[in-house]
Every structure is written in structure tokens, then in C-alpha cells.
């Protein structure tokens, strides 16, 4: 007997899946080392990214499988190789548990170059036929992100792997309709692509450094002055006026990164475990 929709609805249970994670931050904050500590990672590197190679060279992380996608002179087909690699990871037999793109903002720039040269013949002008004619190029890029990139990430995720996208950061002026405008950290990607990836991700983690200040009284009137004597490296897990963020796990708003990528990963795992235990206890008590 065929079950009705309502019978299927009542019988359905959520299937646990690994997370889709966007990690971004300032240069040198430790994004690659952080991601290298995820379970059984493989790194897909955009052209010119050397962070993982330096970490392996100096023994900061163990040897990790990687591939750099590089365009040859006058060529723009490396982005196709990247998409093929995603397909192979989604369908092939392997023991990788985490797929890291380092950095996805670099992959997006490679996509921009491909669209610019193949769809607009290298014309980045604002006149008709140009990449920047009423956002024509950005729209083509966005369409490819939606139809070619996200489905592949989801296919990898459905196979039981964690998807991690690393991005560089930049600041953006936010026009505030209720008060003064302000600056906010976001990913270094076109705004629409940034928004789409943030909506898609389960976690958006902003890695930042805050100075540790020491105050001293000096000069006329014992005026208080401050100097930096160290730094705190933090992972911000929620959205705020200062930075884009998100999580679906009830994480604290900030998690200590510690002094290494290993510490950062261990602290994230501990925070996830604590959050899950709190939810379980709350459910049992209700």
C-alpha cells in the first residue's frame, strides 16, 4: 500500500550530515592551519596560494594531499579542472573526510577571469557587451555558482564529507538606514556571491586578532596611554555589525583560537560538543 504524504511526513527523520563551513579572516591569521586540522583533509588550492605548502615545509602540519589549480599562459580552463576534481571527490572511492578549498575567493577570481575572457572577450567595460554592463558579468558568475558549484559541494557533503571554504576578508561600508554608516568585515568576494555562500553554509566563522593592551600613566596629568603587549586570536561564530558570521549549533559568540591551528580546531570541537550536550539536556528536561 502506498503511503500518503502525511504518513511519510510523520515517519521522516532528519539525517545527520557533516557541516558546510565558510572560514574567512585577515591575512596570516591561520586559516589554512586551522583547516588542516580537520579530519582527513584534502586541499584544493587556487592559483598562487602557498599557505599549506609553507606549513608542511616547516612541520607545522603533517603532509596533506593537495592540488593547485593553475591557468597556463593565456588560458582560463583551470576552473573546469576544479569542478572535475569536485566531481571525482563526490563519486570516487577514497578515504578523505574533509574537502578544503584554499582559498575559495581565489577560485571565484579565477571564475571571473574565465567569464570575462570567454563570455565578454576580455572587455571589462560598462558599455554594452562589456563585463560591467549593468552587472552582466556578475550575473553570469552568480549563475555558475548556483548551478555548477553549490550542487557539487552538496554532492560531496551528501557523501559524508565536511566541506570547508577558506576566504580572504575585506571591509565593506554598510549603509545603515537607522543610524551612522559603519565598516564590516566580509569575504573578499562579489557581494551577491558572498551573500549566497553565507546563506548556504552551516557555519560562517570569522578569524580575527585582537590586541592585548597595557595601560600606563605618563606625562602631564598622568594621562593614560596604551600599548599592545600581545594578541588574542578569536573565532567569531555569529553575525554582528563588525563581521559576518553564522552557526546552526548554538555556539558561543566567540571561541579562542589559541596559538595554533590544532588549538583552534580542538576548541571548536569542544564548543560543538558542549553545545550539543546542553541541547540534549534541555530536551530531556522539557
Residue ranges of each PLM-predicted region?
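Glycine- and charge-rich intrinsically disordered segments
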Residues: 1-15, 19-22, 266-286
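Conserved P-loop
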Residues: 2-6, 11-101, 105-113
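Surface-exposed alpha-helical segments enriched in charged/polar residues
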Residues: 84-87, 91, 151-155, 202
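P-loop NTPase motor core
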Residues: 103-193
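Conserved GTP-binding G-domain of TRAFAC-class P-loop NTPases and closely related GTPase folds
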Residues: 172-286
Amino acid at each position: 500500500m502506498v503511503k500518503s504524504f502525511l504518513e511519510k511526513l510523520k515517519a521522516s527523520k532528519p539525517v545527520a550530515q557533516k557541516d558546510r563551513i565558510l572560514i574567512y579572516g585577515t591575512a596570516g591569521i591561520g586559516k589554512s592551519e586551522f583547516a588542516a586540522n580537520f579530519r582527513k583533509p584534502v586541499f584544493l588550492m587556487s592559483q598562487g596560494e602557498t599557505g599549506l605548502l609553507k606549513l608542511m615545509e616547516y612541520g607545522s602540519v603533517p603532509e596533506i594531499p593537495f592540488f593547485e589549480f593553475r591557468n597556463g599562459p593565456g588560458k582560463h580552463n583551470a576552473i573546469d579542472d576544479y569542478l572535475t576534481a569536485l566531481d571525482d571527490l563526490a563519486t570516487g572511492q577514497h578515504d578523505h573526510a574533509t574537502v578544503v578549498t584554499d582559498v575559495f575567493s581565489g577560485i571565484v577570481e579565477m571564475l571571473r577571469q574565465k567569464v570575462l575572457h570567454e563570455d565578454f572577450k576580455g572587455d571589462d567595460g560598462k558599455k554594452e557587451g562589456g563585463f560591467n554592463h549593468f552587472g552582466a558579468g556578475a550575473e553570469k558568475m552568480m549563475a555558475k555558482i548556483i548551478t555548477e558549484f553549490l550542487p557539487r559541494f552538496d554532492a560531496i557533503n551528501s557523501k559524508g564529507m565536511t566541506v570547508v571554504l577558506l576566504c580572504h576578508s575585506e571591509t565593506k561600508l554598510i549603509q545603515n538606514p537607522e543610524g551612522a554608516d559603519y565598516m564590516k568585515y566580509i569575504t573578499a568576494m562579489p557581494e551577491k556571491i558572498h551573500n549566497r555562500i553565507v546563506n548556504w553554509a552551516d557555519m560562517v566563522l570569522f578569524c580575527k586578532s585582537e590586541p592585548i593592551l597595557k595601560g600606563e600613566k605618563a606625562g602631564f596629568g598622568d594621562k593614560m596611554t596604551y600599548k599592545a603587549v600581545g594578541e588574542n586570536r578569536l573565532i567569531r561564530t555569529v553575525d554582528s555589525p563588525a563581521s559576518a558570521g553564522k552557526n546552526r549549533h548554538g555556539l558561543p559568540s566567540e571561541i579562542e583560537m589559541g596559538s595554533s591551528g590544532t588549538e583552534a580546531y580542538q576548541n571548536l570541537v569542544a564548543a560543538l560538543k558542549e553545545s550539543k550536550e546542553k541541547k540534549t539536556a534541555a530536551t530531556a528536561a522539557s
